[in-house]
Amino acid sequence: MTYAPVNDVLSGKLAVDSEVTVRGWIRTRRDSKAGISFLAIYDGSCFNPIQAVVPNNLNNYDNEVLKLTTGCSVEVTGKIVESPASGQAFELAASDVKVVGWVEDADTYPMAKTRHSIEYLREVAHLRPRTNVIGAVARVRNCLAQAIHRFYHEQGYFWVSAPLITASDAEGAGEMFRVSTLDMENLPRTDAGKVDYNQDFFGKETFLTVSGQLNAEAYACAISKVYTFGPTFRAENSNTSRHLAEFWMVEPEVAFADLNTVAKLAEDMLKYVFKAVLAERRDDLEFFNDRINNEVIARLEQFVESDFAQVDYTDAIEILKNCGKTFEFPVEWGIDLASEHERFLAEEHFKAPVIVKNYPKDIKAFYMRMNEDGKTVAAMDVLAPGIGEIIGGSQREERLDILDARMREFGIDPEHMDWYRDLRRYGTVPHAGFGLGFERLVSYVTGMGNVRDVIPFPRTPRSASF
C-alpha cells in the first residue's frame, strides 16, 4: 500500500484512480442522509485537508466512522478521484477507514472546531499546531529556515554551530541567563563573601549566549565566509509583542569585507527568502492574507521588487526633524531610533526598505568599527515597511588598540576577552556581519503581530511552560 502525504494528492502528483492511504487527523466530519460521511483529514503537509468520501457499507461505519470527532487520528485507504465539488480538485473515495487514536472526550477537547483566540492558543502551545493558523506558521517558518540555509550555501558560506554556553557577553549589556550547577541553598563563597564560581561546573561564571557573533568572527577570520543559525537568549524583562527570552538568530560574518558588503548581503538574502516563500508556501500566505493581514502578499511582492534606500543616521535624524510629524519620542542626534521613527522612514519617507548607516558610537556595541569622525561607528540597521528594524549589523573593529579602548568604555576588561583580541593580534583583517532575528522575519512574512505566535514554545518573562 502506498502512503501519501495529503499535499501529494491535492497537488495532482499522484494519478487519478490510483489507490493510496493517507494518515492524519479529523478536522471535521459531515454525514449525509444518503448514508455517506465526508471526512476532512489533515496531516500538516499543506494548508488544506483532503476530503474522504466514506460509504456506509464499510464494516466499521456505524460503530467507528459515525463516532469520529475533531482530532481523532485515522488511516484512510481509497482511490483518488476528481472532486465534483468546488474548493479542491481531488478527493478520496474511501474503501477502508482505520481509527488510530480517539479523542477521549470530544466535549472537552481544547482544539474543538470552533475558532479560538490567539491568546487562548498560547495557553495550549502543545496543541496549537493542530490549528490552521499555527500549522501555517510552522510551514512558513520551515520554508524560511530552509531558504536561509540554501541562500548561504549557494553563496559559498559555511554554517558554524556557535556554542550556547559562553563566558562572553557579545552585546556588553549584561542581560544574560547564568548557567550554574551550584547548590543555590548553599552557595560557596570567596574570602570576600562573593559567590565562588571557581567551584562551579566550568570553573568560572558562564551564561546562555546572547549572540553567536563573536564565535562566528573567529571562524570568518579563518575560512572567510560563515554564518550561524541557532537559539540565543536575553534576560530582558520585556513583555512586548517584539521580545522573547529565547529566540533564533541568523548571523553571517565575512572576512575582507566592509559595511557595504554586508548591506548588499542583507538585501540579497531577504529578497531570496521572500521569493522562496512566495513560490513555495502560497496556500499558507493566502490564508494569512485573508485572515490575519490583507497586505501580507502585496508587501512581500513589493519588497522583492524594491531597490533598498540607504541613508546616514545623521541625515535620517534631519529627515525626522523636518518631516512635520510629531513623534511620541522626540528626535535628536544621539538617540536610538524608536519603532515609530523606523517605520516613518521606511513606510512614509522612502516608501521602501531602507538601510540606516553610521550610528553614534555611544548607542552601539563595543565591537563596531569606529569611523574617522570619532563620533560614529560603521553600523547599520535594515528597516522594513510594516515592522521597522529587521536586521542590525556592522563592520567589526579590527584595530586592537581601538578595540581595547572601546572595551574599557563599556566597562569590559580586555583581559577577559583575550581570545577575541587574538583575532586582531594574529593576521587581523577587516570583517563585517549582521544579525537577523528569525522570529521577527517570520512575523513579518505571516503578518502575525506577536513573536510569541511564530515560535513553537515561546519563552517570556514569568512564562516557561511545556
Curated annotation (Swiss-Prot):
Compartment(s): Cytoplasm
EC class (word): ligase
PROSITE patterns (UniProt xref): AA_TRNA_LIGASE_II
One Pfam family, short name: tRNA-synt_2
SUPFAM superfamilies: Class II aaRS and biotin synthetases, Nucleic acid-binding proteins
Gene3D superfamilies to which the protein is assigned, alphabetical: Bira Bifunctional Protein, Domain 2, Nucleic acid-binding proteins
One function term, GO molecular function aspect: asparagine-tRNA ligase activity
Single GO BP term: asparaginyl-tRNA aminoacylation
Keywords: Aminoacyl-tRNA synthetase, ATP-binding, Cytoplasm, Ligase, Nucleotide-binding, Protein biosynthesis
InterPro entries (UniProt xref): Aa-tRNA-synt_II (IPR004364), aa-tRNA-synth_II (IPR006195), aa-tRNA-synth_II/BPL/LPL (IPR045864), Asn-tRNA-ligase (IPR004522), Asp/Asn-tRNA-synth_IIb (IPR002312), NA-bd_OB-fold (IPR012340), NA-bd_OB_tRNA (IPR004365)
EC number per UniProt: 6.1.1.22
Catalysed reaction equations from the record: tRNA(Asn) + L-asparagine + ATP = L-asparaginyl-tRNA(Asn) + AMP + diphosphate + H(+)
GO cellular component term, pick one: cytoplasm
HAMAP family to which the protein is assigned, alphabetical: Asn_tRNA_synth
Complex and partners: Homodimer.
Family per record: Belongs to the class-II aminoacyl-tRNA synthetase family.
Protein name: Asparagine--tRNA ligase
Source organism (scientific name): Vibrio cholerae serotype O1 (strain ATCC 39315 / El Tor Inaba N16961)
